[in-house]
């Protein structure tokens, strides 16, 4: 049976004189094969008392399982993002059921942004931009160009990057959810 797939998630971290800005956004399209099943899915969430932002790309049911597991790790480790991410990937790699999950997470708090994969990777981007999912490459390119050539906020860059990805990627729509810290 085919799984629900297709999305774009982008996160931008930007330094300003007032401090770091971070935002994560995602589109709302869910596809089953080549059919759009839903256009208003919320793939970006606030976790751990609103202090952590998370977005997922991949199989929808798998991603919700990972959200729950990740939030439990955040609670266990008092909101320490990197520690919770490493502990989640350890479980993801060693648990027979979790190992079959097909999803990626983009997570961020006030100081750190990470990509968490089912391969056991916990990656911190060098430039503060994370982009995952089918339209990720388009959104990442747009975000990098906007960071280098504008004074837009992190949230504005995320919104514009998602819009650009939505114009190019057939698995990305224009219904966006964006959260910022």
From Swiss-Prot:
Task: Note the SUPFAM superfamilies from the entry.
Answer: N-terminal nucleophile aminohydrolases (Ntn hydrolases)
Q: Which CDD domains match?
A: protease_HslV
Which cellular components does GO assign to this protein?
A: HslUV protease complex; proteasome core complex
Task: Please list the reactions this protein catalyses.
Answer: ATP-dependent cleavage of peptide bonds with broad specificity
Q: Could you state a single Gene Ontology molecular function term?
A: metal ion binding
Its domain of life? Bacteria
Q: Which residues form the active site?
A: 7
Is Acyltransferase one of the keywords? no
Task: Note the InterPro entries from the entry.
Answer: ATP-dep_Prtase_HsIV_su, Ntn_hydrolases_N, Proteasome_sua/b, Proteasome_suB-type
| Entry's localization field | Cytoplasm
Is the Transmembrane helix keyword given for this protein?
no
GO BP annotation list: proteolysis involved in protein catabolic process
Pfam families in the record: Proteasome (PF00227)
Q: Where, by residue number, does Na(+) bind?
A: 166, 169, 172
Q: Which cysteine pairs are joined by S-S bonds?
A: none
Please summarize the record's notes on activators and inhibitors of this protein. Allosterically activated by HslU binding.
Q: What NCBIfam families is this protein classified in?
A: ATP_dep_HslV, PRK05456.1
Question: What does the sequence similarity comment in the record state about its family?
Answer: Belongs to the peptidase T1B family. HslV subfamily.
Oligomeric form and interacting partners: A double ring-shaped homohexamer of HslV is capped on each side by a ring-shaped HslU homohexamer. The assembly of the HslU/HslV complex is dependent on binding of ATP.
The record describes the protein's role as: Protease subunit of a proteasome-like degradation complex believed to be a general protein degrading machinery.
HAMAP family listed in its UniProt record: HslV (MF_00248)
State the protein's name: ATP-dependent protease subunit HslV
Tell me what organism the protein belongs to. Variovorax paradoxus (strain S110)
Q: What is the lineage of its organism?
A: Bacteria, Pseudomonadati, Pseudomonadota, Betaproteobacteria, Burkholderiales
């Amino acid at each position: 049976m085919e799984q629900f797939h297709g999305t774009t998630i982008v996160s931008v971290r930007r330094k300003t004189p007032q401090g770091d800005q971070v935002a994560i956004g995602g589109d709302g399209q869910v596809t089953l094969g080549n059919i759009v099943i839903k256009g208003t899915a919320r793939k970006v969430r606030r976790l751990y008392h609103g202090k952590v932002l998370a977005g997922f790309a991949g199989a929808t049911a798998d991603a919700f399982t990972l959200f729950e597991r990740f939030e439990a790790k955040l609670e266990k480790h008092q909101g320490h993002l990197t520690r919770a991410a490493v502990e989640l990937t350890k479980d993801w790699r060693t648990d027979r059921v979790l190992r079959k999950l097909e999803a990626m997470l983009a997570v961020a708090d006030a100081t750190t942004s990470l990509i968490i994969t089912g391969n056991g990777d916990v990656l911190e981007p060098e430039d503060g931009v994370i982009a995952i999912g089918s339209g990720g490459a388009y959104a990442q390119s747009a975000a990098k160009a906007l960071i280098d050539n504008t004074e837009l906020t992190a949230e504005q860059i995320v919104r514009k990057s998602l819009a650009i990805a939505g114009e190019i990627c057939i698995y990305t729509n224009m219904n966006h959810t964006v959260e910022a810290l």
